[in-house]
């Protein structure tokens, strides 16, 4: 079983995912008129399922983003790049969104939330038991492989992995634990843009 728990709402969510998948597969298999929503859904699904094309493309689809990231030479260039990447759903250090004010649901606020750690929980970076260390080592191997797939040789990929782990570990140390994240009062720090 892949779930730590599986209640009635989880079952509903899983059934919903399966129904949506069935709809998408049916749409993608059909003949859809050019420019229709069905054609767009089918195209994106078929593209995502075409592993031969994806492997042949390599990093080409994200090459422009990689070049922008590589071109950053000064800290002042990071925030504008983060804003640009956010348009593609990439939030490197923290996430932000507009949502209801938890103290006044009639009001929406621009909200920031911790992020920047790929392993999900801060303990994966900070704990040193055998299981956690093994997970962290596998993650390091994954980072090296991703950099190699992006065109870096093994030595450069390992150096970049060390930089990634250093940054993510520092972010993890500054992050709230899962328990702290569940405390609404500890996570509510309403302020103006000037105060931010």
Regions found by a protein language model. Give the residues of each.
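Zn2+-dependent metallopeptidase catalytic domains
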Residues: 1-196
């Amino acid at each position: 079983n892949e779930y730590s728990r599986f209640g009635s709402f989880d079952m509903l969510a899983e059934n919903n995912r399966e129904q949506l998948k069935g709809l998408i597969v049916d749409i993608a298999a059909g003949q859809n008129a050019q420019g229709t929503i069905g054609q767009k859904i089918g195209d994106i699904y078929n593209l995502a399922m075409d592993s031969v094309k994806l492997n042949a493309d390599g990093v080409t689809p994200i090459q422009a983003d990689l070049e922008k990231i590589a071109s950053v030479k000064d800290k002042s260039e990071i925030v504008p790049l983060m804003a640009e990447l956010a348009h593609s759903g990439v939030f490197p250090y923290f996430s932000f969104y507009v949502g209801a004010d938890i103290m006044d649901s009639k009001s929406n606020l621009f909200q920031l939330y911790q992020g920047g750690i790929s392993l999900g929980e801060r303990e994966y970076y900070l704990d040193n038991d055998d299981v956690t260390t093994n997970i962290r080592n596998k993650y390091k191997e994954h980072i090296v492989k991703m950099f190699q797939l992006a065109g870096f040789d093994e030595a450069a990929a390992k150096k970049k992995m060390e930089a990634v782990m250093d940054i993510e570990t520092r972010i993890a140390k500054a992050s709230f634990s899962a328990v702290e994240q569940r405390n609404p009062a500890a996570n509510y720090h309403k302020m103006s843009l000037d105060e931010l």
